[in-house]
């Protein structure tokens, strides 16, 4: 059963649009990590996201792929940048 890893991003004060696009580009580049089926990331276009300005959806082969994805060095590096520049909220569910 596939797993959806959803992430909501809210930039910290002073983080501009160029930095957010750089972050989204780095997230989209994680498709090489084993277990990843697809990655989508973009800017929110509504006022219904509780302050989040950007979102990410990562589709993984299964819930068993999540630990490897989260612990992969490339994901860790992107995660460090995310936490430096954004407030992050994540949710995972099987589909």
What positions do the PLM features span?
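Conserved catalytic core of Hanks-type protein kinase domains
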Residues: 59-60, 81
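A common structural junction motif
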Residues: 28-33, 74-80, 85-86
């Amino acid at each position: 059963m596939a797993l959806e890893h959803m992430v909501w991003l809210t930039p910290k004060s002073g983080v501009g649009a160029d930095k957010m696009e750089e972050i989204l580009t780095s997230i989209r580049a994680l498709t090489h990590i084993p277990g990843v089926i697809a990655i989508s990331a973009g800017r929110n276009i509504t006022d219904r996201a509780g302050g989040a300005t950007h979102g990410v959806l990562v589709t993984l082969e299964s819930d068993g792929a999540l630990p490897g994805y989260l612990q992969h060095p490339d994901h860790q590096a992107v995660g460090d940048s995310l936490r430096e520049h954004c407030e992050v909220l994540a949710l995972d569910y099987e589909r």
